[in-house]
Amino acid sequence: MTIDRTYPIFTVRWLAVHGLAIPTVSFLGSISAMQFIQR
């Protein structure tokens, strides 16, 4: 029972981390690309 309760929490946390990390990486990548194009 304990494993069943811990696994969904870990999955939600994993999705939340990736949900925040992917847009951040793409946002930083777009900024660096824009600065590179300006030069």
From Swiss-Prot:
A single GO BP: photosynthetic electron transport chain
Keyword Ligase on entry: no
Organism: Beta vulgaris (Sugar beet)
Any one of the GO CC terms: photosystem II reaction center
Lineage top rank: taxon: Eukaryota
Any one GO molecular-function label of the UniProt entry: heme binding
Cofactor note text: With its partner (PsbE) binds heme. PSII binds additional chlorophylls, carotenoids and specific lipids.
Cofactor: heme b
Binding locations of heme: 18
Family matches, as Pfam families: Cytochrom_B559
Name this protein carries in UniProt: Cytochrome b559 subunit beta
Transmembrane feature ranges: 14-30
Function (record text): This b-type cytochrome is tightly associated with the reaction center of photosystem II (PSII). PSII is a light-driven water:plastoquinone oxidoreductase that uses light energy to abstract electrons from H(2)O, generating O(2) and a proton gradient subsequently used for ATP formation. It consists of a core antenna complex that captures photons, and an electron transfer chain that converts photonic excitation into a charge separation.
Known partners and oligomeric status: Heterodimer of an alpha subunit and a beta subunit. PSII is composed of 1 copy each of membrane proteins PsbA, PsbB, PsbC, PsbD, PsbE, PsbF, PsbH, PsbI, PsbJ, PsbK, PsbL, PsbM, PsbT, PsbX, PsbY, PsbZ, Psb30/Ycf12, at least 3 peripheral proteins of the oxygen-evolving complex and a large number of cofactors. It forms dimeric complexes.
UniProt keyword list: Chloroplast, Electron transport, Heme, Iron, Membrane, Metal-binding, Photosynthesis, Photosystem II, Plastid, Thylakoid, Transmembrane, Transmembrane helix, Transport
Compartments (UniProt record): Plastid, Chloroplast thylakoid membrane
Topology term for the membrane: Single-pass membrane protein
Family as reported in the entry's similarity comment: Belongs to the PsbE/PsbF family.
